[in-house]
Amino acid sequence: MKLFRLSVILMGLALSATMMAQGIIRHKTPVTTSSTKRQTAQPAASPAKQQAVAQLIGNMVHVQGGTFTMGRTSSKAYWCDDSDKPAHQVTVGSFYICKYEVTQKLWKAFMGSNPSWTKGDNMPVAWVNWVTAQKFIRKLNAFSGKKFRLPTEAEWEYAARGGNRSHNYLYSGSDDINDVAWWADNSGNKLHPVGTKLPNELDLYDMTGNVFEWCSDWQEPYQGSAQTNPKGPQSGNAKIKRGGDIYSYNSTCGVMSRSQCRPDIATCCGLRLVCDRL
């Protein structure tokens, strides 16, 4: 009887081995869920982007809102440009603005390329048109979860003047342009690292000179009436840029001076970021 049982067991083992070899019996394959696949497919966050965003947030300055006179007044200006007139009262709300222009390091972290002629991680990115600036901001916001944007022209001028700490300087931080700006007379026609001149009353650097800075507004003539948080017209042919650049003369660099350019044209223009909250 024992021999019979043993022979039956051996026959069963042999049959099982044969069926496995022929693929009749298969081991269960672990089920991979769609969520597991998604987790596996997600790339690791870029350390360069994380570092760039952390540095950007650390350099944001809170600007307390207030009311100021926007446009050209006759008190210190010794030239006249009708686009800067008439002076008018404007009220802006509080916002955050970066103390530096967007650097080439920050730009490259999200765009991969660098359009600037003078290269250097700590130099402002330049030769950026308005359309590409918006593309950069969308990528930055998608990664950071923040809502960075370009300043309105009113926000830009309010910050350049020093906000509610303003001393009414002709340039952003001084009546002597050489204190605060890289411009036609001292730049050597090349970009310079951000933050190497004196800041203005809000601790903002290079609001005058180095590179023009894009604003969000379409260009239109000033109306002269008091306004609150103006954003410009809904459409137009040119976008506002402010502050002057390394090729600009002092008549273009005043805190009230206005310039404009088509949004698809790249000049010696960069950008400075603002946001409503951090």
Spell out what each predicted region is.
Residues V8-T18:
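Bacterial N-terminal signal peptides
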Residues K76-V90, N164-R165, S187-K190, M207-L278:
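Surface-exposed recognition segments
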Residues D179-L204:
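A short, contiguous structural element within a folded domain that forms the immediate neighborhood
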Residues Y158-Y171, P221:
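Secretory-pathway/luminal and periplasmic proteins that interact with or process carbohydrate-rich
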Residues W107, W130, W156, W182-W183, ...:
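Signature tryptophan residues that serve as conserved aromatic anchors
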Residues L3-R5, A21-A154, A238, R258-L278:
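Extended beta-strand/loop cores of jelly-roll/beta-sandwich
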Residues S116-G120, Y171-G173, G224:
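Feature responds to low-complexity, polar/acidic, surface-exposed segments characteristic
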